[in-house]
Amino acid sequence: NDLFGNVAPAIPTSGVDVVTGVGAGKGYLMKQGMTVVFSGWQGDRPSSLSGPTAAITSAKKWYAPGMTLPVAKENGARITGASQDEFIADNASSNLLGTYYPRAANTAASLTIRKTPTDAPITVDASMWTYTAGTGVAEGGNTGATGFGFVTIDRAKVRASSAYAAALDAGSDNGSIYHFNYTASDPKPMGLGFLAVRDLISFLKYEKVDLQGNANPVAGNITTTLATGISQSGRYLRDFLWLGFNTDKQLRTVFDGMLPLVGGSRKTYTNYRWSKPGDYSRQQETHYTPGDQFPFAFSTITDPLTGKTDGLMKK
């Protein structure tokens, strides 16, 4: 009922090593002549298999590796731009909102609150929140000192003030939407995550050596390539297909088949400036996040609302 059987894989000491020893578990898929490749694509996730990010255990025999991306520059200069991060509490005490990107120094910022996504936001007085910069070692959205930064909200003062009554539910801000609006800096070209998977699979499928002369470990042995992803990675595969990345630079087919699971009708918030690949639109949370727009189906159809004609397999 899993990829490896009932034996826990052994974790290498370095993220660049091969999972060895009992890493293949009982090797069921390999005994059927298959090669299993886990490919990182999310540029805001750790790419190391070691330390606290290691996720291969007896109970969880897979690992979703990230990828290391450069910080984008414009003619060598730092890029800044408007960004927004969200906080919704389900209890009375949580009060930390982690920013997904570093806040540019000496720039204005504001915090707003609203009851539902379609309500007009109410600006929270600056005396009711503080921003603390982080070291940027951890992932975006982290609310600790090693994140990019975080906002501490004095929710008790917000609840006590009549100025925000319209954004509350009978005096409670549980479920209310806080937005931190700020000037972000140092975006990463997250869309390269599509190229990374495309080029990796194309290399394994077609090439003998890479541009540095490194040998393809499975050269000549790959006849059919299949991709599968669950939930977020399922949405990624739908986006990958729609954006046209299933054809490599030589116009060769990358994946012969795909099995995106639990992705629903969605794509991802990846190939955008100030993107957040792990985020997605929900009824209340991050409601306006890109990735839940037409097209939804694999076949090419016309959307009656926008008049657009498109499909995930059109390209």
Residue locations for each model-derived region?
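C-terminal His-loop and adjacent cap/lid subdomain of alpha/beta-hydrolase
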Residues: 1-315
